[in-house]
């Protein structure tokens, strides 16, 4: 699983940082690609990466501020010209349908693929299919804004070969079926339940990507024990009052949440342009407070391997 950051700034683009966008590539699932938020010039950033616009299957929007959605119309139109013939699903708060349909209609843009737009307003399960569960929770911003939690289904445990050999089952197709969780029948008529010949399930990976928000206690159980938490850190703590007034978090807020939720990795983004030329200082400050913290920059890629157990 790869996380590609195309925009790590806040509000408006700067020389160092574009506005919000992050793609996730699922390497073990035929390389499927999802996009979270789509600020202005996201498609241009994608051109400078290994992500293929035509292969993006789902887009998730945290909220309707311009720095998170102004790149959508152009990206949706360009997808048709970059091999994007397969269906595309777009998820976002109420209003995203009107924004997209109006922009495409006024600009006379016709997409050549099936575009499905799903609006949501209530937090909860968005879908559970293709080996992944996606859930949402409402945050605390100046407009409705959400976090997404993506949880990979658990994988079957290790095949207990010695136990199968003791049953007289030779290596072959039956091993593969059991590894896939299927019940098999031997030539003798005996049925073997897969669970009896598999070790403990291997926990699926998980991550939470939160949109703009003040600190919100409901995020603690929502992000509990996830592998990766992607959270805004618009300001440093000396601007805490200012941050909270405008619906944002500080670096210290995000780090406190990461500790309370016991996450493995924290990736900080949505950095104010006031901190230009301070990337090294920000990274040092974050890592001193949380060892597995990273202050993302544009084109930063984070790799999350398969869980071993």
Curated annotation (Swiss-Prot):
SUPFAM superfamilies: Metallo-hydrolase/oxidoreductase. Its cofactor is Zn(2+). CDD domains: RNaseZ_ZiPD-like_MBL-fold. PANTHER family: ZINC PHOSPHODIESTERASE ELAC PROTEIN 1 (PTHR46018:SF2). It is an enzyme of class 3 (hydrolase). Its EC number is 3.1.26.11. The active site is at 67 (proton acceptor). Binds 2 Zn(2+) ions. Zn(2+) 2 binds at residues 67-68, 212, 270. It comes from the Bacteria. Homodimer. Belongs to the RNase Z family. This is Ribonuclease Z. GO terms for molecular function: 3'-tRNA processing endoribonuclease activity; zinc ion binding. Zinc phosphodiesterase, which displays some tRNA 3'-processing endonuclease activity. Probably involved in tRNA maturation, by removing a 3'-trailer from precursor tRNA. Keywords: Endonuclease, Hydrolase, Metal-binding, Nuclease, tRNA processing, Zinc. InterPro entries: Metallo-B-lactamas, RibonucZ/Hydroxyglut_hydro, RNase_Z/BN. The gene is rnz. It catalyses: Endonucleolytic cleavage of RNA, removing extra 3' nucleotides from tRNA precursor, generating 3' termini of tRNAs. A 3'-hydroxy group is left at the tRNA terminus and a 5'-phosphoryl group is left at the trailer molecule. Zn(2+) 1 binds at residues 63, 65, 141, 212.
């Amino acid at each position: 699983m790869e996380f590609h950051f195309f925009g790590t700034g806040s509000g408006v683009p700067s020389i160092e940082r574009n506005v919000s966008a992050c793609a996730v590539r699922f390497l073990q699932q035929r390389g499927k690609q999802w996009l979270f938020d789509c600020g202005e010039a996201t498609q241009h950033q994608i051109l400078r990466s290994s992500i293929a616009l035509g292969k993006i299957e789902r887009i998730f929007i945290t909220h309707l501020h311009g720095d998170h959605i102004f790149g959508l119309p152009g990206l949706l139109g360009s997808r048709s010209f970059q091999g994007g013939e397969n269906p595309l699903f777009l998820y976002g708060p109420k209003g995203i349908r009107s924004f997209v349909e109006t922009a495409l209609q006024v600009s006379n843009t016709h997409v050549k693929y099936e575009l499905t737009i799903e609006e949501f307003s209530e937090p909860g399960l968005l879908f559970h299919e293709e080996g992944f569960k996606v859930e949402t929770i409402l945050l605390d911003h100046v407009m409705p804004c959400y976090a997404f939690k993506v949880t990979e289904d658990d994988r079957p445990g290790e095949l207990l070969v010695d136990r199968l050999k003791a049953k007289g089952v030779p290596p072959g197709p039956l091993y593969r079926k059991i590894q896939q969780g299927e019940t098999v029948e031997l030539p003798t008529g005996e049925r073997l339940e897969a669970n009896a010949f598999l070790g403990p399930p291997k926990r699926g990976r998980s991550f939470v990507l939160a949109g703009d928000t003040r600190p919100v206690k409901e995020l603690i159980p929502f992000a509990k024990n996830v592998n990766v938490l992607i959270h805004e850190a618009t300001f440093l703590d000396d601007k805490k009052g200012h941050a909270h007034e405008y619906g944002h978090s500080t670096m210290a807020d995000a780090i406190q949440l990461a500790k309370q939720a016991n996450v493995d990795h924290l990736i900080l983004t949505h950095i104010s342009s006031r901190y230009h030329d301070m990337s090294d200082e920000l990274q040092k400050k974050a890592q001193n407070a949380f060892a597995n913290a990273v202050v993302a920059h544009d084109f930063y890629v984070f790799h999350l391997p398969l869980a071993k157990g």
